[in-house]
Amino acid sequence: MKNILIIGCGLLGSSLLRRISKKKIAKKIFIYEKSKSNIAKIKRLKLPGTIVKSLKEGASNSDLIIFCTPMSEYKNIILKINKFIPSKTLITDIGSSKIETSKIINKFLKKGIQWIQSHPIAGSEVSGPEHGKENMFTDRWCIIIKEKNIKKNNINILTKFWKKIGAKVVVMSAEKHDKIFSITSHLPHLIAYNLVKSAQDFEKKQNYELIKYSAGGLRDFSRIAASNEIMWRDIFFNNKNNISKAIDLFIKNLNQFKKDINSKNNKSIVKKLTQTKKVRSKIIKLKQDIDKPDFGRN
């Protein structure tokens, strides 16, 4: 690839920027960032690439365009760059829900342009280019979404790109993707936000100093709950049907736990705790985390 445009240079956008530059995946990297604060940080950090003042300047000269913005901004960006995109340019993104994005692409993107959705499974609760890491995507899964109108050769091109970035690639449908991540990512974040909110409400209602006594459990949930609120609002809204079903399943299991606790059902509780404990071992075995206390953060 000769030229790549990164639209949005926050945590993940800047991580891509660092990696593309180090691996010399493109001859030129263009950066479009509307936040003056982020632009100042990019300059202060002396990150590689060329900051462009307009989407036209970047889009008209790029072989690959990567959307690294909140999903709620996709439509407006598409409408701004449509007439400037060269016919052979590929577009991808890093969004966490795909069905709604497919609808936006099909409705607003100029006909003939290939947008192949991506979802690299990487990130952090912090945001901004100062927190980006060159190895952010190393050995992480990247989901590529296959749709009817997508050319196989273009999927191969994008697959090679993500492998050069360091990711492990798997191809699946938007429907399958959104169902999987409603459980593995979206529901856990929703639970984290609500657990921390419950702690706040309890502290206020009981007039206890509660937060300062946070044990490991609440502390780890609070880390997740510190994630970018705009990004997660978009995810919750865009995958609302699957997330609603995941919430129903969680409530069903939570009510069963409540019933077992109140009735002191030893057999049922121990069985559930034993079964769920095995998931942690499986996650480590699949190299999705490390087997160290405190998740290796110390």
Cite the ranges covered by each PLM segment.
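Interdomain hinge/lid region at the active-site interface
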Residues: N207-Q275
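NAD(P)+-binding Rossmann beta1-loop-alpha1 motif at the extreme N-terminus of oxidoreductases
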Residues: M1-S60
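Internal alpha-helical scaffold of NAD(P)-dependent oxidoreductase catalytic cores
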Residues: E134-D220
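Rossmann-like NAD(P)(H) cofactor-binding subdomain of soluble oxidoreductases
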Residues: I77-E130
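Rossmann-like NAD(P)-binding element
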Residues: K56-I85, T89-L90
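Residues at the starts of beta-strands that form the adenosine-phosphate
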Residues: N3, K28, Q114, W141, ...
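Glycine-rich, N-terminal phosphate-binding loop of Rossmann-like dinucleotide-binding domains
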Residues: C68-P70, G95, K146
